[in-house]
């Protein structure tokens, strides 16, 4: 009985230690360019649904010549699986590769996720109020 209690205690301690090391990427992220908010606004929201399952949503905007009032946008929304520090988003022909660090997302390989000149590519920083 003592051996079982010790084994269960060790399992609980190792589980708690693992949980403390796995980062939580949930939050609101905004795209930055040269340490400033990007003039072509883009944001991504991650909501944790399970241990490695997130709901991902976001919007990216491209503003053309102000005299012509051209504005194009793209939207993303779906359930994604975190694999290591990467999310591969693929919904309705829109694909993204997202690499996650503690407070940043790096989006690349944007394909088909918005109107003309719209892209989600770039570096996103988690806003402090969403941590």
State what each model feature region is.
Residues 21-42, 120-128:
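Tryptophan-anchored aromatic micro-motifs
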Residues 14-16:
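N-terminal signal peptide c-region/cleavage motif recognized by signal peptidases
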């Amino acid at each position: 009985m003592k051996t079982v209690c010790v084994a269960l205690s060790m399992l609980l301690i190792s589980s708690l230690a693992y949980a403390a090391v796995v980062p939580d990427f949930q939050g609101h992220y905004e795209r930055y360019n040269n340490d400033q908010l990007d003039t072509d606004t883009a944001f991504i929201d991650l909501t944790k649904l399970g241990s490695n399952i997130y709901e991902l949503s976001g919007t990216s905007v491209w503003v053309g010549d102000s005299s012509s009032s051209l504005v194009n946008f793209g939207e993303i929304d779906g359930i994604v699986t975190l694999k290591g520090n990467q999310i591969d988003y693929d919904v309705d022909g829109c694909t993204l590769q997202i690499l996650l660090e503690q407070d940043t997302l790096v989006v690349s390989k944007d394909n088909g996720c918005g109107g003309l000149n719209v892209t989600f590519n770039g570096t996103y920083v988690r806003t402090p109020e969403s941590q």
